[in-house]
Amino acid sequence: TEGKTDVRYLKAALMKLYTQYPSLIEKDDTGRFIFKIKFFQRSKRWKYFFGMSLDGGDAMKVLYRYFTGKKGAKDYFSYFQRITGRRQLSPVILLYDNEIESKKPLKAFLNEDAGITELQKQELKNNLQLRLLPDSTLFLLITPLTAGKAECEIEDLFAPDLLGLTLDGKTFSRKDKPNKDKHYGKEIFFEYVLTNYQSIDFQGFIPLLDALNSIVENCKSSTT
């Protein structure tokens, strides 16, 4: 994902809608949620050894290059398949905000690294997902467009009344460094979402979760 709060939003949405996605999450007898997919945790160690930034979309470009050997990166995908004699089974999914046209991380990734065709771009727009390499389970996943918007960030999947919520006299700002006298940022917004996930409307997330579930289900069926 592009940002650390993106993963948290997804987890909150899955917790609310867990009965619809048994391949992605389940709830045990004690009421504890168990995620059946793993979310990549960025760290200083990953940054030191592999050059992956702690935030933003650049880390996913770096990961993609380790699958392809592009831009001078080592092709770890082929290397480990060769030395283990096993093919990759579980999908690796790169989640981007749906900002194909503007100068944002997704457009840069598509133009500078993935180099997809216009036909593939249309497939991505229609299905919200695209297999990036023919012989792998590396996928690109993007957020759905909402309310007739030409582009969409993951926060746009929340209902407008939630995005307009006032907390302690402050309104929500998506900026990295909001004016703290007037606005609260993504961290506080997420804490509110997590605390109140049972009452929050996650309907806007369903197309994204459906696409994610489709990738997982298809990869699972291809290995059985």
List each model region and its residues.
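Acidic, divalent-metal-binding catalytic cores of TOPRIM
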Residues: 1-224
